[in-house]
Amino acid sequence: MSYKEGDVLVTNGEQSPGYKIVEIKGLVVGITVRSRGLGKNIIASLRSLLGGEIKEYVELAEQARLQALQRMVDNAKALGANAVVNVRFDSNELSEAMDEIIAYGTAVVVEKSS
């Protein structure tokens, strides 16, 4: 899967069709730490009694992933890259109410293939 985040190509593959890697800049990481918050925890706890999707946590997870991804892209730009390949996400629970979300990949310079 490939897409553009601003002017930076982002893909979970080793390369993106139609592009060739001309320079490897190195590892880039984007991190965010999010608190679930008391209000959302109460609502989510009530929803969990009924079963099904807990929308408050889904929304929080989506926002955290996007922020980690944007920080990774910003770090790639700072290195002079115009693409990030092999993008992955990871997460860790830091405490009962806080999670760390990490986006990481390899910053590269790509050119369109001829």
Swiss-Prot record:
- Identify the domain of life: Archaea
Q: Which Gene3D superfamilies match?
A: Hypothetical protein apc22750. Chain B
One Pfam match:
YbjQ_1
**SUPFAM superfamilies annotated for this entry?**
YbjQ-like
- Membrane-crossing residues? none
HAMAP family, alphabetically? UPF0145
Concerning PANTHER family, the annotation shows: UPF0145 PROTEIN SCO3412, UPF0145 PROTEIN YBJQ
Protein family (similarity comment): Belongs to the UPF0145 family.
Query: Under what name is this protein listed?
Result: UPF0145 protein SSO1976
Q: Which organism is it from?
A: Saccharolobus solfataricus (strain ATCC 35092 / DSM 1617 / JCM 11322 / P2)
